[in-house]
Amino acid sequence: MLLFAAATLAAGLRPGTVQAEEPPLKLVALGDSLTAGYRLPAEAAFPAVLERALKAKGYRVEIANAGVSGDTSTGGLDRLDWSVPDGTQGVILELGANDMLRGTDPAVTRKALETIIVRLKERRIPVLLAGMLAAPNLGTEYRTRFDAIYPDLARAHDLVLYPFFLDGVAGQRANTMDDGLHPTAKGVERVVEGILPTVETFLGRLGQKPEQKGQ
């Protein structure tokens, strides 16, 4: 009986034995129109482009698009439970741009984002926080209070932070639509190029490593 068990175990360890593939890491991109892909086909939206970029580097991931155009941080909080289903293993949180455009009190935005973070932590779902910067025309006081939200929350909750989601896109006509706000398909590619190293750091925290070619 022992010989049979040993032979069976040895057979299972032979080179070339087919092993079941691990399922992909399930992420959710929770955000507004910048995540949803305003006026873009689904395959050109941020989550889809990021997923392809990560897969090209050997990561096994699936990124659900939970972006809603026009959403605020409070709106994201209201829909958190159904936008981030059970089984989610990480969240890329991108909210606050519409709060800023509406001149919402930064204290309101901060509270909503922090509540989202805390509730996800309670569910043991790690968060990558994608930051936003206030427009210059909102004044120095508002900008100071708003811009501090993201680094403050990242420090307080030990989050991976990408300081400015639209870095390389905001103010660049070649990368924005005619409204001057939303990224074009080219702009989304620029966003992904910028955030990719930060996402890889986040995946490292989750124990996710890229597969080596040939595996």
Name these PLM-found stretches:
Residues 1-4:
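N-terminal export leaders
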Residues 7-8, 18:
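Cleavable N-terminal signal peptides
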Residues 19-69, 79-87:
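Serine-esterase "nucleophile elbow" of acetyl-processing enzymes
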Residues 70-74:
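Acidic-and-aromatic substrate-binding clefts and catalytic sites of carbohydrate-active enzymes
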